[in-house]
């Protein structure tokens, strides 16, 4: 499995057993000026969403590009 990973936003091979890609977004102190923090990576199971987070998981290679990378 290959997923985009932060902080370098490069596609990387996931560790064994981590077969899902994820995108996690949340607001930090600077949310109003810079927007949400975005974290990308690999996981074995989709994490539980906390009230202040948005999490999207997907199962195809490189299915989690940073929003600014999309055409």
Curated annotation (Swiss-Prot):
Cystine bridges: 3-21, 14-42, 27-31, 46-57, 58-63
Keyword Cell cycle appears in the UniProt entry: no
InterPro entries per the UniProt record, alphabetical: Snake_3FTx, Snake_toxin-like_sf, Snake_toxin_con_site, Toxin_cobra-type
Compartments in which it is found: Secreted
GO terms, molecular function: acetylcholine receptor inhibitor activity; ion channel regulator activity; toxin activity
Gene3D superfamilies: CD59
Highest taxon in the source lineage: Eukaryota
Tissues in which the UniProt entry reports expression: Expressed by the venom gland.
Principal location class: secreted
PROSITE patterns given in the database record: SNAKE_TOXIN
UniProt keyword annotations, A-Z: Acetylcholine receptor inhibiting toxin, Disulfide bond, Ion channel impairing toxin, Neurotoxin, Postsynaptic neurotoxin, Secreted, Toxin
GO terms for cellular component: extracellular region
Family, per entry: Belongs to the three-finger toxin family. Long-chain subfamily. Type II alpha-neurotoxin sub-subfamily.
Reported function: Binds with high affinity to muscular (alpha-1/CHRNA1) and neuronal (alpha-7/CHRNA7) nicotinic acetylcholine receptor (nAChR) and inhibits acetylcholine from binding to the receptor, thereby impairing neuromuscular and neuronal transmission.
Protein name per Swiss-Prot or TrEMBL: Long neurotoxin 1
Organism name: Naja melanoleuca (Forest cobra)
